[in-house]
Amino acid sequence: MAEITSAKATAKTVRVSPRKTRLVIDLIRGKRVADAIAILKFTPTKAAVEVENVLNSAIANAENNFGLEKANLVVSETFINEGPTMKRFRPRAKGSASPINKRTAHITVVVAEKE
């Protein structure tokens, strides 16, 4: 049986826009874990905080479940899927209303050992 060299973490229905979150994950894809955490710490967006939480969870999964070393890990795969959209309405002039879409995202981060 092959040895497991990667670990995954997912956050579902996170209240951040998928489009804005994709901009953040593009910054860390392929980087070493320590570098990725440093980048996310200094990225001043709500999406960066959420992605950092998922990344830390993936690192913990790698260490605790599979016995991988944190120093050898890289962010091998990250992707954002669109979650359910909450639809709301804002009252406007003359009895009309404008729609508001509160978007959510599913954030997935996979960390793997560097060969």
UniProtKB/Swiss-Prot annotation:
Superkingdom of origin organism: Bacteria
PANTHER family linked: CHLOROPLAST 50S RIBOSOMAL PROTEIN L22-RELATED, LARGE RIBOSOMAL SUBUNIT PROTEIN UL22M
Keywords: Ribonucleoprotein, Ribosomal protein, RNA-binding, rRNA-binding
The protein's name in its UniProt record: Large ribosomal subunit protein uL22
UniProt cross-references to PROSITE patterns, sorted A to Z: RIBOSOMAL_L22
GO molecular function: rRNA binding; structural constituent of ribosome
Function: This protein binds specifically to 23S rRNA; its binding is stimulated by other ribosomal proteins, e.g. L4, L17, and L20. It is important during the early stages of 50S assembly. It makes multiple contacts with different domains of the 23S rRNA in the assembled 50S subunit and ribosome. The globular domain of the protein is located near the polypeptide exit tunnel on the outside of the subunit, while an extended beta-hairpin is found that lines the wall of the exit tunnel in the center of the 70S ribosome.
Quaternary structure and interacting proteins, as annotated: Part of the 50S ribosomal subunit.
Pfam families: Ribosomal_L22
Coiled coil, from the record: none
InterPro entries: Ribosomal_uL22, Ribosomal_uL22_bac/chlpt-type, Ribosomal_uL22_bac/org-type, Ribosomal_uL22_CS, Ribosomal_uL22_sf
Gene3D superfamilies noted in UniProt: Ribosomal protein L22/L17
Family of the protein in this entry: Belongs to the universal ribosomal protein uL22 family.
Cellular component terms per the entry's GO annotation: cytosolic large ribosomal subunit
GO terms of biological process kind: translation
